Amino acid sequence: RPLSAESQMKALKKYRWPLTGALLGALVFLAVYGVRVLDPTSGGWILNNPSPDPAQHYLGWELFRRSPVHLPYIGANYNAVYPFRTSVLFTDSLPLAALLFKLLGGVLPARFQYFGWWGLACYMLQGGLAQAVIARIAGVQPTVDRSSSKATIGVIMSPQQTAKLWGSVAGAGLLVLFPALTMRMFAHTALAANWLVLLALYLWLRS
C-alpha cells in the first residue's frame, strides 16, 4: 500500500535531524574542556581562568542569585555595586539562565555554575546546525523507501547523496573546531553562541 504524504514527511523529518554533527560537537567540547566543567559545583576552572571574563560571569551570577527581588526589576542585581542597582545583563551572566536558576535557588547547592553546560550546548548546536546548513546548501535530498511497510518506513539515498551527507558531517567537524568558538568559550563564555549565525542561515535557507 502506498505511503501517505504524512508518513513520508515523518520519515524524512526523522532522518534530517543532524544528530551526527551535534555528537561531533559534544565530543570536541569534552576533548578540549574535559568532563569536570560539567560539574555544577565546580567553579575552580572559572575562577582560575587566565581570562577575567569567566570569573566576572560567575561572580555576577552568584551575586545575582542572592540579590533581593524588587518588582518590576526582575533582572536587577543589588549586590554587585551596593548600594546601587545594576543588572545581571552587565556581568554577561547569561541572563535568561540566571533568571531561571534564581527561581530554583532554594534547591540549588551553595556553589552552582551552569556555564559548563552552556558550553556543551553551544558546541552541540554549532555541530548540528552546521551539518544542517551544509546539507541544505549541498542539496542532500533523501527519499522515502516506498517498498517499506508503514511500520518500517525507511530512507534511501544514492551514492552521490551519501557522499554529500558525509561531506556535511565533515564540514560540521570543521566548524566545531572553529578557533573563534574555542577562544570565546575559553575567554568570553557568554559570547560562545556562534551557532546563532548558523541558525539564522538555516532559517533563511529553509524559507
Predicted features by range, described:
Residues 117-137, 164-207:
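Membrane-embedded helix bundles of polyisoprenyl
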Residues 28-125, 178-182, 188-193:
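Membrane-interface coil-to-helix junctions
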Residues 1-40:
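Start-transfer (signal-anchor) and selected internal transmembrane alpha helices
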Residues 41-42, 46, 73, 137, ...:
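Intrinsically disordered, low-complexity segments enriched in small/polar residues
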Residues 2-10, 139-153, 157-163:
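Short, basic, low-complexity termini and linkers enriched in Ser/Thr/Gly/Pro
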Residues 106-111, 135-140, 165:
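Secondary-structure transition/capping motifs at alpha-helix termini
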